[in-house]
């Protein structure tokens, strides 16, 4: 059985854009070009409206197809896999230790960390909202079974308020989650995540950490150091480590940064 981690670009969105492009082109030809049953100013107006709609839909369809192919686990680029594996490399569990993946989606990062740390266990949590309907708890469990991973489990949880006591886990990780939580203070989310990390535990949090979303992250790094964290580092993953600057720009992933270290 092969795991199905799903694409970060939902098929439904891509097919909707393709359908919208085809429909707007058909309407442009019928009313704007051939002027079937319309004429004069109305023909011109409809031609402009459907022409603009076609150009916009075609542009977004082109981007969507490119992004889908880039992220696909079955494609040549496999960018999602590179990001997941690259993030998992920074998670280390002690013998019998437990790590937490926040916003686990289809379970890819949870499972990757579990495979790298057979001496411990990984827990993946997510609220599995309607906006990401292709991700689910049963899907995560199926993927773990497909990978032959027995040291990973999944449950519902909310990144805004983690239902765990302080210093509960030996490692915490997350990938492209917090930027999706609108209205939340991103640095506060990071502190909430690190609250449940044990002293000496490792962390690797990957997200779009642009100043507009996260504020001054260099100051945040210094804050953690002042709090006694053993090691804290910000890594720009658009420098070729995960993706090239060109890919980051085309895929709207500029600002991709990995916050790693040890508490």
What do the PLM-derived regions correspond to, one by one?
Residues 106-118:
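Conserved SAM-binding loop of SAM-dependent methyltransferases across substrates and taxa
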Residues 187-199:
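A short glycine-rich, Lys/Arg-flanked "PGG" loop and its adjoining helix->strand segment in the class I
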Residues 200-207:
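Conserved beta-strand signature within the Rossmann-like core of class I S-adenosyl-L-methionine
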């Amino acid at each position: 059985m092969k795991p199905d981690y799903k694409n970060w670009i939902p098929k439904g969105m891509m097919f909707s854009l393709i359908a919208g492009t085809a429909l707007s082109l058909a309407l442009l030809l019928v009313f704007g070009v051939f002027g079937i049953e319309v004429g004069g100013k109305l023909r011109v107006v409809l031609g402009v409206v459907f022409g603009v709609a076609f150009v916009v839909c075609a542009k977004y369809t082109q981007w969507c197809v490119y992004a889908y192919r880039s992220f696909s686990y079955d494609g040549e680029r496999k960018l999602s896999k590179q990001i997941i594996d690259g993030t998992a490399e920074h998670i280390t569990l002690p013998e019998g230790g437990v790590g937490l993946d926040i916003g686990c989606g289809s379970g890819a990062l949870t499972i990757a960390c579990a495979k790298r740390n057979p001496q411990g266990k990984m827990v993946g949590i997510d609220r599995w909202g309607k906006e990401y309907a292709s991700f689910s708890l049963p899907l995560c469990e199926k993927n773990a079974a497909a990978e032959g991973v027995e040291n990973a489990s999944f449950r519902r949880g909310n990144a805004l308020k983690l239902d765990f006591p302080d210093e509960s886990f030996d490692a915490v990780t997350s990938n492209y989650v917090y930027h999706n939580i609108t209205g939340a203070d991103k640095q506060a989310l990071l502190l909430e995540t690190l609250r449940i990390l044990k002293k000496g535990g490792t962390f690797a949090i990957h997200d779009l950490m642009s100043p507009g979303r996260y504020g001054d992250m260099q100051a945040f790094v210094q804050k953690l150091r002042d709090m006694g964290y053993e090691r804290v580092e910000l890594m720009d993953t658009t420098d070729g480590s995960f993706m090239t600057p060109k890919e980051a720009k085309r895929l709207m992933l500029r600002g991709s940064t990995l916050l790693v270290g040890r508490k």
